[in-house]
């Protein structure tokens, strides 16, 4: 009988995970308290929303371990298009440093200024201006209407006051009788991911060329103070939902995660609910952010159900293909900046042991990582690295990243022959890391802070071919400085990371980048330190509709210096700045294209 009851419970849990988690919608609230629990969600084959009854509105400090930070500004509801029958969708929120302040060790709170002043964590003015990022996510298969309301009951203005980014994708926007904004979201097998921005809620970032300033300086970016992103995801394909049984699945219980709770079965399943790492590696309970999940080598699949919110990070040890699927959330909010898993998770950078949200350090070769659906929040460092064998590839789609305010918070490594599509990444480091051949990236939306380029292909000499990047929407940038080491550019290549190295004329990079839109005042198109040849490097259909930066800081200028013995085979076509086409007549550094390429390359490149 006990076995039958367990099987029934697991079956019910699996059924719920397959269609989404139905949780609790909002009642009355005020900052620092939980929301109410009146149920008005919906989960069906048309669309599925969910709720957390442990939502905590708190814009200043860490939330309680079992709570989820909830937007102080917005509520979101979803209806089947045209029916005006709206259901609640939880609105999450992320704040810079997660309310911890500048801390050095996870054991430091409630002290909040223990990180040495010499350490730049990438966050400066953001907390003082109240910058935050909210998001709501749901599953859908039909056209839906998404209503956005202000939590204080005030009007969000007229549709003309709303900008939806990427602007290259248009939406019908209307105003509701209760002061909200309604957006019609068409059914899309690839889903829709977009930022909803209100003209009355924009912050203009000013820089003096060294740091953000509150007066004077030059405009380097404009962002919402209270950002809101909508993730409308397709239901998971059946092949990305594991076949779970009591024998092959370790089903987690919402609440604290103690060492070993994740078991040794093939599948690790997180049903709807909130989870947090409760113990350090020695089994001591207490301070948060002192451990991560080190999976058993038997475990190859992590499934995060819609409504699962896991405060932690995942490290794989399997030798077979491995998976991270489901529309749940993996949050690094309890970790300090650059959390060093090899040194008690303190804020000391290590390229080898600082924590990744997704990690594998013992690859067996010939493996593929499948990542479909998850959202990661507040990463403390690089977000994904797999080490130990070069025979690794990835298949990544419907993958979202938010709250990446710290430095070093990049996009995932894109390994050989990887396929990445329909992603939305908020980053403060390299967004699209092109270090290997055969990769394909399509329909990527990037929200960039101020560190490193959108596309990175430097740090060492590389032999790369067969790479395509298509339909790239850069919806925000706010570079503080004109940089070439950490390029302030759309397409960048940093100089050597290691010392004592020289460019390699035997190697070359070849790729095609197409259909790029950069919104707002854009940084340079290129900042390349040549470490090898560039051969048949095609960039086509690039639009900077709002123009290039023309400030005295110089962030709008593309820079490609000379490199002895190397060639620069660039072919740029249909590049427009403010609607005007860049050509061989107006590309110059003091003209429309601000394209400063060394004269030694003349005849090797062209703009048409």
From Swiss-Prot:
One of its GO terms (cellular component) is extracellular region. GO terms for molecular function: dextranase activity. Its EC number is 3.2.1.11. It catalyses: Endohydrolysis of (1->6)-alpha-D-glucosidic linkages in dextran. Glycans are attached at residues 39, 571, 574. Keywords: Glycoprotein, Glycosidase, Hydrolase, Secreted, Signal. Residues 20-34 form a propeptide. Residues 1-19 form the signal peptide. It comes from the Eukaryota. N-glycosylated. It is found in: Secreted. Belongs to the glycosyl hydrolase 49 family. This is Dextranase. The gene is DEX.
């Amino acid at each position: 009988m006990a076995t039958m009851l367990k099987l029934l419970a697991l079956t019910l849990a699996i059924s719920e995970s397959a269609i989404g988690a139905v949780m609790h919608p909002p009642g009355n609230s005020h900052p620092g308290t939980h929301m109410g629990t009146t149920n008005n969600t919906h989960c069906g084959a048309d669309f599925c929303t969910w709720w957390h009854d442990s939502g905590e509105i708190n814009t200043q400090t860490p939330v309680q371990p079992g709570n989820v930070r909830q937007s102080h500004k917005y509520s979101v509801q979803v209806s089947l298009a045209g029916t005006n029958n709206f259901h609640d969708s939880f609105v999450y929120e992320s704040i810079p440093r997660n309310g911890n302040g500048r801390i050095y060790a996870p054991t430091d709170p409630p002290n909040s200024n223990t990180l040495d002043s010499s350490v730049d964590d990438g966050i400066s003015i953001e907390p003082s201006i109240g910058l935050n990022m909210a998001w709501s996510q749901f599953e859908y298969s039909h056209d839906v209407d998404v209503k956005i309301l202000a939590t204080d009951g005030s009007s969000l203005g007229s549709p003309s006051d709303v900008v939806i980014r990427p602007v290259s994708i248009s939406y019908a926007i209307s105003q509701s009788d209760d002061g909200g904004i309604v957006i019609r979201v068409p059914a899309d097998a690839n889903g829709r991911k977009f930022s909803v921005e209100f003209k009355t809620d924009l912050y203009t970032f000013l820089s003096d060329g060294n740091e953000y300033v509150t007066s004077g300086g030059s405009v380097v970016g404009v962002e919402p103070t209270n950002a809101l992103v909508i993730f409308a995801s397709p239901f998971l394909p059946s092949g990305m939902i594991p076949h779970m049984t009591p024998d092959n699945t370790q089903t987690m219980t919402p609440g604290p995660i103690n060492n070993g709770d994740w078991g040794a079965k093939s599948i690790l399943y997180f049903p709807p609910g909130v989870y947090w790492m409760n113990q350090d590696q020695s089994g001591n309970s207490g301070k948060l952010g002192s451990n991560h999940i080190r999976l058993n080598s038997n475990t190859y699949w992590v499934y995060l159900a819609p409504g699962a919110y896991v405060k932690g990070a995942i490290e794989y040890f399997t030798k077979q293909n491995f998976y991270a699927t489901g529309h749940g959330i993996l949050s690094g909010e309890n970790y300090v900046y650059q959390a060093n898993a090899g040194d008690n998770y303190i804020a000391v950078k290590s390229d080898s042991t600082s924590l990744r949200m997704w990690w594998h350090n013992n690859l067996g070769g010939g493996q593929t990582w499948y990542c479909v659906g998850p959202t990661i929040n507040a990463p403390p460092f690089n977000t994904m690295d797999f080490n130990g064998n070069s025979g690794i590839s990835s298949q990544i789609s419907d993958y979202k990243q938010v709250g990446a305010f710290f430095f070093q918070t990049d996009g995932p490594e894109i390994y050989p022959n990887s396929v990445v599509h329909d992603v939305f990444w908020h980053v403060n480091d390299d967004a699209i890391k092109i270090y290997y051949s055969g990769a394909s990236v399509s329909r990527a939306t990037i929200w960039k802070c101020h560190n490193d380029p959108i596309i990175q292909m430097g740090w060492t000499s590389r032999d790369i071919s067969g790479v395509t990047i298509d339909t790239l929407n850069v919806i925000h940038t706010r570079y503080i400085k004109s940089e070439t080491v950490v390029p302030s550019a759309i397409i960048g290549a940093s100089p050597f990371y290691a010392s004592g190295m020289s460019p390699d004329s035997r190697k070359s990079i070849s790729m095609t980048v197409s259909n790029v839109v950069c919104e707002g005042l854009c940084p340079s198109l290129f900042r390349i330190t040549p470490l090898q040849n560039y051969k048949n490097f095609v960039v086509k259909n690039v639009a900077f509709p709002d123009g290039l930066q023309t400030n005295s800081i110089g962030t709008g200028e593309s820079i490609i210096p000379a490199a002895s013995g190397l060639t620069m085979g660039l072919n740029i076509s249909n590049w427009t700045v403010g609607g005007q086409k860049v050509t061989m007549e107006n590309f110059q550094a003091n003209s429309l294209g601000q394209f400063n390429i060394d004269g030694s390359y003349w005849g090797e490149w062209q703009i048409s």
